[in-house]
Amino acid sequence: MRYVKSALFVVLAIYLPGIGDFPAAGAVPSQTSSPNEVSAQTESERAKLVGTYKLIGRETKDANGTWQSTPNFNSSGYITYSVTGYMGVHVMPNDRTPFTGAQPTAHEAKTALEGYTAYYGPFSPDEDADGKFVVHHRVGQINPGGEVDAKRFYDFASDRLILTPAAADGSKARATRRVLWERLPEVPLSDEAEQFVGFRQLLYTDRYTEREGRQVTHGQQNESRAGSYIIYTPTGHMMVHLMAQEGRTPYDGAIPTAEEALAAYRSFGGYFGRFTVHEGASPPYVVHHQEGHLRPRPNAPTDAERLYQLNGAILRLGGRPRMSNGETTGGHLYWEMLPARPE
């Protein structure tokens, strides 16, 4: 056991595993930058942000310009920044009402999205006259038409990270809300678990059918959600964002209608929590301890078990196979480690 010193790292729908090897992975490109591309200050600021943080509160500015704690704060979530230049966040209101059926009604979907934040992508620290800020380049998010480059001023207070969304004019002085996060410590991970740590993007999914130990069908690679993220961190946490590439229509207004919310819900999925790797099992598997989920769940965390194979930069995940009428069916998700971004 040893402490992880490497990068940080995001699955929703259950897919099932099959037999056979998966594609060999290429080497992950190393991080390179010339002296003209990066300043010592920028390097330092990225390093300062790197980590996984737990949501601990929100504040709003009153008429006198004083920051006040948000009354009845009751949300949970994590934000994580990697040394390779990527970030992800999930924030969920607590005490949500589960759906009455297997699929939500339009009204239930609208309620499920209220107060839920989830997005992912690269990040870039910078500075202007108002202070230091980080831009979250959101390549994926729940809101189909949400802001792509989200500017957040940041400050540190001991182990706390304070993120202040910029005002409409891009300033900090006119900002009226901020979010409080607490840095989490890294934990001892096994050598196998360390290989999970990092940010990966989805390449494709597949499905298969077997009969009497022989593969009778193997579906084509499905790339409809390619580019989604799965993240494993040195703190023992994970999160996943699964987003459809096509068919996501922006809302007509600032708040979605019930039908717009249902369409957004169907095209985006994700959860967050801790992870545990069982490399000694046969076959080996990883458990995603789901503390929060886009789909409202009962208060108790749900454990999602995923069989896995690691092959260089590629991580293959899938649920356990299902057997019915003499046939075994399953599927996989193939995730590739993202390369380090130049600073």
PLM segments and residue spans:
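Positively charged n-region of N-terminal signal peptides that target proteins for export
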Residues: 1-5
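Bacterial N-terminal signal peptides
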Residues: 7-21
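Lipid interaction determinants
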Residues: 25-118, 122-343
